[in-house]
């Protein structure tokens, strides 16, 4: 991100440095940008009539800076370990971050689509909802890029680690977004996101119908409920040294019964465990 911003402007470097004052916020922006880059390129990347970004670097920078307005908020708010009440002073300040971000990017001379992503990524289809802000914003003002990053923003907010809440398992977050498609989020773009990520995104820990536990390692092209998986714990509850590969699209006698929180099972070693799977 620093390298990309350095080729853009000194102002971009400055706001990124400001975001780094909160590890939680900075990590959120990094994760959102990483997901946005993959999903947007799959949907629009090959069509120059629909892809507004001049190159991949601009795409990453724009998606990273969607929350740039939080750079104006004090660390005591960004890293607070408690959830704020809706009528609290802190919550009112948080709700201003899209306007702060739009103003900052406009002053920096950033393209209009980047300003749009910062300003409207919290606007819902039903603007009467408390979770929709800025209050006077209309959903029609949100670009397709903004509508996509709104979905990715809430997905990462749910699955990411937060000091004031327990993170959601990725499958639960995907179900949440699916239920709100056409209510809070753009239905068509939500559908694209579902098909790109799958009901069980890569790396999701799941329990199979026989009681074994496995990591999802693919997004199926047809039945989103039946990804390829690698079993890490058998039906007897024993951890395996050599892990079994299964394609649930082929193994019809098995299915996924539920998603699991990998932090509950593996703690901070979850990613390392997943990256070092040994398939027999």
Features from the language model and the residues they span:
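Conserved beta-strand-loop-short alpha-helix elements that form
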Residues: 147-160
């Amino acid at each position: 991100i620093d390298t990309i911003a350095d080729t853009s402007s000194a102002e971009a470097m400055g706001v990124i440095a400001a975001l780094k004052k909160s590890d939680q916020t900075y990590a959120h922006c990094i994760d959102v940008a990483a997901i946005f880059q993959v999903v947007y390129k799959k949907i629009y990347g090959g069509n120059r009539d629909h892809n507004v970004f001049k190159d991949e670097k601009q795409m990453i920078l724009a998606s990273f800076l969607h929350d740039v307005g939080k750079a104006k908020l004090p660390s005591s708010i960004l890293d607070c370990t408690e959830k704020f009440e809706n009528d609290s002073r802190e919550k009112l300040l948080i709700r201003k971050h899209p306007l702060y971000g739009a103003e900052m990017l406009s002053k920096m001379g950033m393209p209009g689509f980047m300003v749009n992503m910062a300003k409207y990524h919290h606007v819902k289809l039903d603007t009467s909802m408390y979770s929709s802000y800025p209050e006077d914003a209309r959903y029609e003002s949100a670009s397709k890029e903004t509508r996509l990053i709104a979905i990715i923003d809430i997905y990462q907010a749910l699955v990411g680690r937060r000091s004031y809440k327990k993170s959601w398992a990725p499958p639960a977050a995907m179900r949440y977004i699916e239920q709100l498609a056409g209510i809070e989020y753009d239905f068509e773009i939500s559908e694209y996101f579902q098909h790109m990520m799958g009901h069980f995104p890569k790396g999701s820990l799941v329990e199979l119908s026989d009681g074994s536990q496995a990591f999802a390692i693919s997004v199926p092209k047809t039945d989103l409920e039946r990804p390829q998986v690698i079993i890490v714990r058998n039906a007897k509850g024993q951890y395996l040294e050599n892990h079994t590969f299964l394609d649930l699209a082929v193994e019809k006698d098995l299915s996924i019964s539920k998603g699991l929180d990998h932090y509950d099972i593996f703690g901070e070693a979850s990613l390392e465990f997943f990256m070092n799977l040994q398939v027999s």
